[in-house]
Amino acid sequence: RVYDFFDESWARPVPVGGMERWCISCDYGTVNPTSLGLWGLRGGVWYRVSESYYDARAEGRQRTDGEHADALERLAGGRPIWKVVADPSAASFIETLRRRGWLVEKADNDVLAGIRTTAELLRRGRLGICQGCADALREFTLYCWDEKAGGDRVKKVHDHAMDDIRYFAASVA
């Protein structure tokens, strides 16, 4: 596993009280799943407090960019979102969000550096994954290295929440 130290015992309760800042991270997929994470900053720790995960294959239909943007808006829930950190390859989705008034930053997509940053922030307690984030918690247990590819490459499965978390860690945290 990529994050071999991480298991469900790392899951934290959502902190009680307000957050200092809010951010959303997203890994966009048309056929592959789209994973959105809602992050709140409190006392120097970014908490993934909620998420939205849509798997078009499992649901039997693809969503439009507008439908994904609606899901992001529902996830935001009226909170003052500082910015959205998005999959840099999701040009049409980024444009849809910008037209709706969201401040969107293209994420740093260096996979290995992002994995190292994510692991370090988790170990130092600077990133917390909250108990209600079932898809992220599930993917942490399944995300693994591709032994057949040679070198440091991850398997491109069970990586959608992992990618949005990596984008967040590399670009914001």
Q: What does each model-found stretch correspond to?
A:
Residues 155-173:
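Acidic, Mg2+-coordinating catalytic module of metal-dependent nucleases/exonucleases
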Residues 31, 92, 159:
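Short, well-structured alpha-helical interface segments that form or flank functional binding sites
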Residues 25, 137, 157-161:
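Alpha-helical architecture
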Residues 1-28:
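ATPase catalytic-site recognition across NTP-hydrolyzing enzymes
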Residues 37-156:
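Mg2+-dependent endonuclease catalytic cores in nucleic-acid-processing enzymes, primarily RNase H-like
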Residues 18-50:
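Acidic catalytic cores of enzymes that act on phosphate-bearing nucleotides/polynucleotides
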